[in-house]
């Protein structure tokens, strides 16, 4: 598990390290939001890394924007740990 505190740090990690198997990201982050970070990450990785959004933002515009980015999953906070586990299992069982 690699923890990045903001979108810029996550992109820096992707530029200089082996790609992770999964990115779990909030939409509302400092410096660069999760949507912008995902767009840039997809350019860096060719969209090869599934992104699971875990966020308190549940308005229709945000959800649809994440879907257009081909988000692998979307969990609204607050959540139970079993939701994360279930989504990660689902993603890894069917991701490309």
Residue ranges and their predicted role:
Residues 34, 66-72:
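As written
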Residues 24-26, 37:
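Active-site T/S-Asp motif of two-component receiver
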Residues 18-24:
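Active-site beta3 strand of CheY-like receiver
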Residues 61, 79-89:
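C-terminal output helix
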Residues 3-12, 34-36:
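Helix N-cap/capping motif at the beta->alpha junctions
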Residues 29:
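Receiver (REC) domain active-site loop signature in two-component systems and cognate sites
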